[in-house]
């Protein structure tokens, strides 16, 4: 397991990255589809920040966590940092596909760190954004 901490001068944690155990990385590289699904969730409890997650899917459509990271916010810089750390763990994967929502930071990170990977958007996120747009136009 790789653990990487980045701190400010004042000692506050601004970023943390955890690459899950070697077994999961080996499973992803050897046995799973070359597909990574990436998303983030905002932490709203005592510890604020953004939890970034990268998962893969096995042949039985089971979700396998590959890496997780926590940063102060969901920005292009934090996504590039997360993707670079992910690439350190998995290396260059041929025919890699990355699925995410349409966050500009993820798109920028995919283009910068995995330029040869196919980057697609999650249909569920596209549908929810369309429904939200329709509700706003009715109001």
List the model feature ranges, each with a label.
Residues 1-139:
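DNA-binding interface regions
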């Amino acid at each position: 397991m790789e653990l990487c901490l980045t701190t400010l001068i004042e000692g506050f944690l601004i970023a943390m990255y955890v690459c899950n155990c070697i077994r999961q990385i080996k499973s992803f590289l050897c046995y799973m589809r070359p597909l990574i699904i990436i998303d983030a969730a905002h932490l709203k409890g005592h510890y604020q920040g953004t939890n970034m997650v990268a998962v893969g899917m096995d042949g039985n459509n089971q979700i396998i966590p590959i890496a997780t990271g926590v940063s102060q916010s969901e920005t292009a810089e934090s996504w590039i940092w997360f993707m670079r750390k992910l690439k350190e763990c998995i290396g260059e994967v041929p025919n890699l596909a990355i699925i995410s929502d349409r966050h500009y930071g993820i798109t920028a990170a995919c283009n910068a760190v995995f330029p040869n990977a196919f980057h697609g958007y999650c249909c569920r996120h596209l549908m929810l954004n369309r429904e939200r747009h329709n509700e706003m136009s009715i109001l």
